[in-house]
Amino acid sequence: MQVYLVGGAVRDHLLGHPYHEKDYVVVGATPEQLLSEGYQRVGKDFPVFLHPKTKEEYALARTERKSGVGYHGFQFFTDSTVKLEEDLIRRDLTINAMAMDETGQVYDPYGGQKDLDQKILRHVSDAFTEDPLRVLRVARFAARYANYGFKIADETLQLMSEIAKSGELDALTPERVWKETSRALMEDHADIYFQTLRNCDALKVLFPEIDSLFGIPQRPEYHPEIDCGVHTLMALKQACQANYGLDVRFAVLVHDLGKALTPTEELPRHIMHEERGLQPVTEVCDRLKVPSQLKSLALTVCKEHLKCHQAKSLKPGTLWRLLQRLDVLRKPEKVEAFVQACECDAKGRLGLEDRPYPQAQYILDAMQIVRNIRAQDLPEHITGPEIGEMLIKYRIEALAQFKQQHDEP
């Protein structure tokens, strides 16, 4: 029985990157042999075992054969005669198809180290096309390693395009698409993930609402980059550079979906695109089963982002109603996420990436003002329904004073 560290841990070890998850493959063993040594079986579809002490995953070396549609459509074969090379060839990329024994010797039958040196993401074999999930995985790797100059091999991108055109992507479950996409959104270059999907024709299959933004013009005085799709990815890039959370990144991604629905005769203006965007944002969230908290912020940013840009010119009552819709009294963290997303929208424009966005602090200061006015601050004779009415009155008056201070030269 021989044990090898495989996959991402070997890749990151060779790159000098930290890694936390370790996967092992066991060659020359049977399930009974591992069970007799105290390993606990956990795999339903194929033999995966937990180490009795470390609880790390150990999988018996296996081969696989395509037997159906999608990423579940495989039959697996495993016994003590399966060789390490046979197990590694079923993996997606050469840089993920390396193994290392306990002495530190690296086994690299498919040129993974060479591709690491040349910064190439390359498929191991033509069997790559048998698993549609690999389109998303490779796009995610492209996003993860963009900082280091990695590029997808032309022939691999061609295979990804073949998968996209084959209809196999339709077999991916919404949960799996969202799992890969949410992980990609948290990479430093999440925009590369979506650009890669577009480059291989997968974006229009998995995210047609986002794909349809490309080619839609905007007014150049507000959007020097002109193209709506380009703006969306530029705004997402801003969210990544600021290291904002998943909720903000997703909201930025879908904030302008309504622009794809603008009547042709109105272009390049996008009147009411905020309202038009609510339906496609809802459809994306429902289709992918996006968590409710993320959906809530995405809809809010879609509907209200222009109000944030106009914040300093809003009347006190209008500003108060905006803060109310943002649930300012119960969820200050949502207000913070909202202004973060809106700032990314404002800065995700060609040549305007570094311009100030004072509206963000203006909204946050206004939030603190209204939150600091509480029922116990009212005169004692105010009771019953009057309390709510007076709180609103006091808050709007405080916002009026706040606005006046900002308006003064």
Where do the model's predicted regions map?
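Catalytic cores of the polymerase beta-like nucleotidyltransferase superfamily
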Residues: 1-409
